[in-house]
């Protein structure tokens, strides 16, 4: 992700109604980054193989059918032998050590100097099961830390693994795919090493209708890792190679294939408008919207994330998502039983609301406000925060009539209640929204009615109390609202205060306190 903006930078997005639409659109990415910062990716970076076996030879036995158990010293001696059977026995034993579910001895195997010989075994085309065991062992070493993955890369494994993608032995080929996926998943450096070694055409050539589903899952996952990470992003050439395959994979029925294909697209759209354009121009949006209706959480989450990323783009890109039917689905997702989905849906809607007023009008046309208000009232706090951002964007860019509809939706009651929230940013944003709505009401000569409504909701008491908040910005914002919009009551309180002073009573300087 790009460098995260400071919280105050994000807050500026919502402060002034009438801010230029293009500027608000440019600032959308900060909202995306805020959500991404707080949430770990659900997709696995690396995977360790514990269960695979080579179909040509039983994995627990030697060629003579006798189970083998070797010490580390015997393994080292075996892998350095010129006897293929001894090499196989030693490599298989090392692989089994590396396949332990708990505490596999990755460091021990690396320090024993086994990687160079295992890389050599990848080239042993006369012994496919030796190739398989070596590829499996390297897969599991590459599933470890970046330092352990580096040992595999610097051992020269990438090119021989790519060559194994052309192996006639399906198990060997699939294991090579898995190893490359682990290497690419480590970060942009090794991802680019795999790309520049020309792995992508070989991976794409493997995709076929007759491919076993486990194999196709591994290919899709490896492709997603080739789309993953930034600083730098994957090169344009790689993206252009992979995109058609991802569109093809999105038509599959397997949820794991769909999930990883969607995650790949989410990585590709988590960037500049140009990168978003590369994806939306393929025509993928209608299919993504369909996948947003999936009952499988592992499909719904990345498809929703991808569409959410897309609407951080230009007005035109956002309109393409709307035209694809996004707003038919998002209001339903606000009512999903998973708070994580509610939050992502609210975030996506907040980015639509950051656009021009005709996008806000489409939000109203699809009746987004009722479920949003329900979340503000009853959602988990992390979801309420995202809903507040959406309301703030709405209020910042809305026309007068749209603001009236916002007030009529009942949004003020939960906003007033959230003024006691422990999150400084959220309180500041709510105060800005209230100020924005009051200013609009003043232009329509409706301020008195709105002030009465805010008073009935307990808003005046809460805003007055915030003048004493330990955060100076909150105190000043609250003071500004009271002075500007509830001036008559302020005049009465000043009269009472003067009477107290005349009677020589001790008093507290609230304005001074508010500025501390």
From Swiss-Prot:
Q: Name one GO cellular component term.
A: nucleoplasm
Q: Does the keyword Cell inner membrane apply?
A: no
Tell me the keywords, alphabetical order.
Nucleus, Protein transport, Repeat, Transport
Give the subcellular location.
Nucleus
Domain IBB spans what residues?
A: 1-57
InterPro entries registered for this protein in UniProt: ARM-like, ARM-type_fold, Arm_3, Armadillo, Importin-a_IBB, Importin-a_IBB_sf, Importin_alpha
Keyword Transport in record = yes
In terms of Pfam families, this protein maps to:
Arm, Arm_3, IBB
A molecular function (GO) term: nuclear localization sequence binding
Where would one find coiled-coil regions in this protein? Answer: none
Top-rank taxon of the source lineage equals Eukaryota
- Per-repeat ranges for ARM: 103-143, 146-185, 188-228, 231-270, 273-312, 315-354, 357-396, 400-439
Q: Which disease is it linked to?
A: Oocyte/zygote/embryo maturation arrest 17: A rare cause of female primary infertility. In affected women, ovulation and fertilization proceed normally but embryos are arrested at early stages of development or cannot establish pregnancy after implantation. Inheritance is autosomal recessive.
Subunit notes for this chain?
Binds very efficiently to importin subunit beta-1/KPNB1 via the IBB domain; this complex dissociates in the presence of RAN-GTP. Shows a limited binding to the RB1 nuclear localization signal (NLS), but not to the SV40, nor NPM1 NLSs. Interacts with RSL1D1.
Family under the similarity heading: Belongs to the importin alpha family.
This one is known as: Importin subunit alpha-8
Specify the species.
Homo sapiens (Human)
Name the lineage. Answer: Eukaryota, Metazoa, Chordata, Craniata, Vertebrata
């Amino acid at each position: 992700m790009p460098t995260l903006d400071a919280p105050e930078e994000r807050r500026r997005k919502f402060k002034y109604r009438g801010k230029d639409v293009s500027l608000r659109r440019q600032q959308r990415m900060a909202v995306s980054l805020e959500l991404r910062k707080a949430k770990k990716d659900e997709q696995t970076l690396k995977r360790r193989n514990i269960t695979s076996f080579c179909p040509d030879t039983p994995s627990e036995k030697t060629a003579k059918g006798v189970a083998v158990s070797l010490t580390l010293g015997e393994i080292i001696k075996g892998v350095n032998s010129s006897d293929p059977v001894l090499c196989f026995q030693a490599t298989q034993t090392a692989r089994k050590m590396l396949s332990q579910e708990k505490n596999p001895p990755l460091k021990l195997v690396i320090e024993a100097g086994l990687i160079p010989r295992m890389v050599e075994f990848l080239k042993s085309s006369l012994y496919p099961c030796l190739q398989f065991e070596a590829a499996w062992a390297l897969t599991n070493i590459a599933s470890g830390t970046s330092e352990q993955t580096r040992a595999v890369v610097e051992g020269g494994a990438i090119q021989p693994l790519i060559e194994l993608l052309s192996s006639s032995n399906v198990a060997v080929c699939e294991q090579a795919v898995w190893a490359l996926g682990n290497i690419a998943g480590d970060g942009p450096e090794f991802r680019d090493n795999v790309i520049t070694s020309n792995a992508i055409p070989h991976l794409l050539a493997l995709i076929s209708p007759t491919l076993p589903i486990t194999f196709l899952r591994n290919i899709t996952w490896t492709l997603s890792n080739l789309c993953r990470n930034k600083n730098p992003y994957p090169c344009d050439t790689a993206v252009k190679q992979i995109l058609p395959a991802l569109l093809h994979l999105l038509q599959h029925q397997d949820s794991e294939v769909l999930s990883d294909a969607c995650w790949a697209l989410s990585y590709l759209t988590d960037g500049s408008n140009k990168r978003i354009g590369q994806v939306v121009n393929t025509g993928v949006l209608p299919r993504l919207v369909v996948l947003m209706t999936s009952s499988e959480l592992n499909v719904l989450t990345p498809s929703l994330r991808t569409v959410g990323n897309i609407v951080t783009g230009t007005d035109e890109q956002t309109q393409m998502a709307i035209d694809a039917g996004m707003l038919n689905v998002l209001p339903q997702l606000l009512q999903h039983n998973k708070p994580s989905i509610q939050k992502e849906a609210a975030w996506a809607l907040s980015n639509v609301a950051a656009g021009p007023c005709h996008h806000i009008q489409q939000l109203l046309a699809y009746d987004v406000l009722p479920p949003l208000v329900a979340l503000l009232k009853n959602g988990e706090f992390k979801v309420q925060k995202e809903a507040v951002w959406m309301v703030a964007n709405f209020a910042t860019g809305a026309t007068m009539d749209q603001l009236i509809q916002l007030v009529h939706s009942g949004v003020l009651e939960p906003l007033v209640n959230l003024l006691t929230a422990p999150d400084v940013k959220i309180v500041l944003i709510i105060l800005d929204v209230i100020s924005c709505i009051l200013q609009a009401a003043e232009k329509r000569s409706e301020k008195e009615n709105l002030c009465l409504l805010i008073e009935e909701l307990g808003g005046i008491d809460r805003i007055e109390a915030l003048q004493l908040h330990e955060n100076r910005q909150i105190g000043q914002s609250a003071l500004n609202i009271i002075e500007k919009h509830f001036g008559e009551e302020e005049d009465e309180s000043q009269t009472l205060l003067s009477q107290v002073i005349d009677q020589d009573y001790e008093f507290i300087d609230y304005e001074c306190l508010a500025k501390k």
